[in-house]
Amino acid sequence: MGSTSSFNRRDLVKRAAALGIIAVPAMGTLSACATGGGGGNDGNDGNDGKGAKNKGATSAKNPLGVKKGAALEAFIFKGGLGDQYAKDAEADYDKTYGVTVKHTGTQQVGPKLQPRFAGGNPPDIIDNSGADHLDMNKLSAQGQLQDLTELLDAPSLDDPKKKVRDTLYPSTLEKGKHKDAFDVFYYAFTVYGTWYSHKLLKDKGWAYPTSFDDMIKLCGDIKKTGVAPWTYPGKYPYYVHFNMFAQIAKIGGLDKWIAIDNLEPRAWTSNDAVKQVVEHYAELAAKGYFLQGSQGLTHIQSQTAWTRGKAVFIPNGSWVENEAAPTTPKDFDMAVGPLFNGGSGDKMPHGTLRAEPSEPFIVAKDGKNPVGGMELLRILLSKKHAQNFATKVRSLTAVKGATEGMRLSPGLSSAAEAVTAGGRNLLMIQLQEWYPKLTDEKLGGLTSQLLTGDMKAAEWIKKAQQYADEFAKDDSVTKFHREA
């Protein structure tokens, strides 16, 4: 995603078919748990349910019971966000616990770690992003992930009177669950949407559209200037889903989107918003509003075309500012806009935004030092390191208000403003996280054909429902459910 989530690729953003416990790239793509009580002061070396094994004595300064001098190993996805932010947190861990964290930065998380999980010797903490990420759903179902409830209930580093959970965006607590276990910690907070150059729009006298109709009209005006209105990474068409799925939820309402997340019968075909949104994308394609050749571009290539002024809009996540930095002009003034209005019948207001946790961290229950892995996360969740993350990689974290008072880069500033303006109308889409093979491979294939004009909207919807039904009936696919 950033990150990505897998989709670099990412979170969240990023994915591909899951085979075994590794998510394998599809279509040339780039990106439970224990139960029981917590630790204590008894220096327990066993795994007492949700509490991590190999604990030392706890104290006010060491609430999780990290053993000083105990080795800690971290595998960090080194994609669009890099891994320096993690190294910085590891340096503080080193100073506190008298050990040098063994650090590996890689884009091959799954291929490197799948055999280690199978062999029972995984690293302690993993940033599980990128196209070649581990299948967390399967790992959770196999009981290989540490339940992180103990971390959530620990005192925060900045204010011991406040629990870690109370410093986080609520969606972080929701998204990290697998049934009754909280075993995935999404560290970043990604804003998905339509990205553009504020300077370009201002110089041309164009206004960011508020509705589908406004967008179609503006695209016509843009095309007349010889510039493409849109581009996208056609080799990874699921990037388009970042916007498409959220638009469906914005227009049709969250309840109807939740039915799609839950793989309910007729969830796609009975939702009028699906028809309206998919037809909008079909219209963009029919009128030639996508940059010629976009269907063959990678995420980096499409971003480069965009930053070089060949296209005005691109669907992406807030990691794009950091990832596209090498080709972005200094005066580009990167910005992100909210979802578009479909009409007077929209269930959610203008300003609605897809903004959700990304960059998934997991702690291996069978690692040598899972409690140390949780402590490294606690350090990362301090204001110091949340701000360091924002400064180094131009992205928000799961820590509420961590960037207040900071001077932010243009893209990050725009994303933060959009989150504030969205208020309670921030959407979280689970389908891409729960069923990546469905969304990235199956639906991604449909979207690829839709955007080249080789598939009609009605056929896209029909086949999307067909694929969703197949997944719903497949007993080999772990199912998830959400109420809100």
Residue ranges and their predicted role:
Residues 91-168, 199-207, 312-313, 329, ...:
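Extracytoplasmic "Venus flytrap"/periplasmic binding protein-like
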Residues 68-79, 99-104, 125:
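Short, well-ordered beta-strand elements
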Residues 177, 186, 415-470:
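C-terminal capping/gating helix-and-loop segments adjacent to ligand/active sites or protein-protein/ligand interfaces
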Residues 1-11, 18-32:
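N-terminal secretory signal peptides
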Residues 54-64, 134-191, 243:
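Hinge/lid segment of periplasmic solute-binding proteins
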Residues 174-187, 192, 216-266:
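Extracytoplasmic/periplasmic solute-binding protein
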Residues 91, 119, 203-204, 287, ...:
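Extracytoplasmic/periplasmic substrate-recognition and gating elements
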Residues 219-222, 262-294:
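Glycine-centered hinge/linker elements that transmit conformational signals in sensory
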